[in-house]
Swiss-Prot record:
Organism classification: Eukaryota, Fungi, Dikarya, Ascomycota, Pezizomycotina
Ligand binding (substrate): 43, 65-67, 96-105, 217, 236
Keyword match Lyase: yes
Protein name: Orotidine 5'-phosphate decarboxylase
One MF term in the entry's GO annotations: orotate phosphoribosyltransferase activity
Length: 270
């Protein structure tokens, strides 16, 4: 079976395709301008660590993934500091909240409480185990400039997000193109001619195969070059490094080369 058209197109070309949401279009243009398809997962526990990591890796990333609920001192200083650095370094913020409850509950989790996610996260994600109404509920609660990734697959061993669940994620995404910008998945899920979903892949680390807790690692070359995904998500491989700035740049270079190899290969066949 031939590979999907989005693998043969540049990020810049995809940004202008019909039905591409404003946030997705901005992200694709940002990726092309900065030459980075790297998202760093900031799995740290204090505001100081979060903001310091954002400063150190900001020039090498297109997106920073956060877990606000593990920040012990999360508050206004966290929010304003993160927004300031994101604007200065030109990256988007993705809160990995993994919403997965009934509609009225996820609306409150998104807009209220101490985290106030709607104020600062450009992108959020959700399971669709509760049913497609979760997409409607989050969409109704958001400003126009917020977008959703559906958690369609995971990188942990033995996870149940396979087969019919993943297929249904794609079905629901196609019904909501103005809000759903893509997926968290291990491979591109673009299959139909009009699909232009952005796929982000976690579990990327150089020189490791697992962590002993179920995580299974892949390389940038495998997920971008072979699986056709768009953005790699790297956590411990960067935030656990002594020189975080240099390590982020190493991942950026390898992921970008994998993308260029894919794109140039298909451009030469046109």
């Amino acid at each position: 079976m031939s590979r999907h058209a989005t693998i043969t197109q540049s990020y810049q070309e995809r940004a202008s395709l019909p039905k591409t949401s404003p946030v997705a279009s901005y992200l694709l243009r940002l990726i092309a301008a900065k030459k980075t398809n790297l998202c760093v997962s900031a799995d740290v526990s204090t505001t100081r660590e979060l903001l310091q990591l954002a400063e150190e890796v900001g020039d090498s990333i297109c997106m920073l993934k956060t877990h606000a609920d593990i920040i012990n001192d999360f508050g206004p200083r966290t929010i304003e500091g993160l927004k300031e650095i994101a604007a200065k370094k030109h990256f988007l913020v993705f809160e990995d909240r993994k919403f997965g409850d009934i509609g009225s509950t996820v609306q409150k989790q998104f807009t209220a409480g101490p985290l106030q996610i709607v104020r600062w996260a450009n992108i959020i994600n959700a399971h669709i185990f509760p049913g497609p109404a979760i997409i409607t509920a989050l969409s109704q609660a958001r400003p126009r400039c917020r977008q959703l990734l559906i958690l369609a697959e995971m990188s942990s061993a033995g996870n149940l997000m396979t087969g019919s669940y993943t297929e249904q994620c794609v079905v629901e995404a196609r019904k909501n193109p103005e809000f759903v910008m893509g997926f968290i998945a291990q491979r591109t899920l673009n299959e139909q001619p009009g699909d232009n979903f952005i796929t982000m892949t976690p579990g990327v680390q150089i020189g490791a195969t697992g962590d002993g807790l179920g995580q299974q690692y892949n390389t940038p070359e495998k997920v971008i070059g072979e699986a056709g995904t768009d953005i790699i998500i790297v956590g411990r491989g960067v935030y656990g490094a002594q020189d975080k700035r240099a390590k982020a740049e190493e991942y950026r270079v390898r992921a970008w080369k994998a993308y260029e190899g894919n794109w140039r290969c298909y451009c030469n066949k046109r």
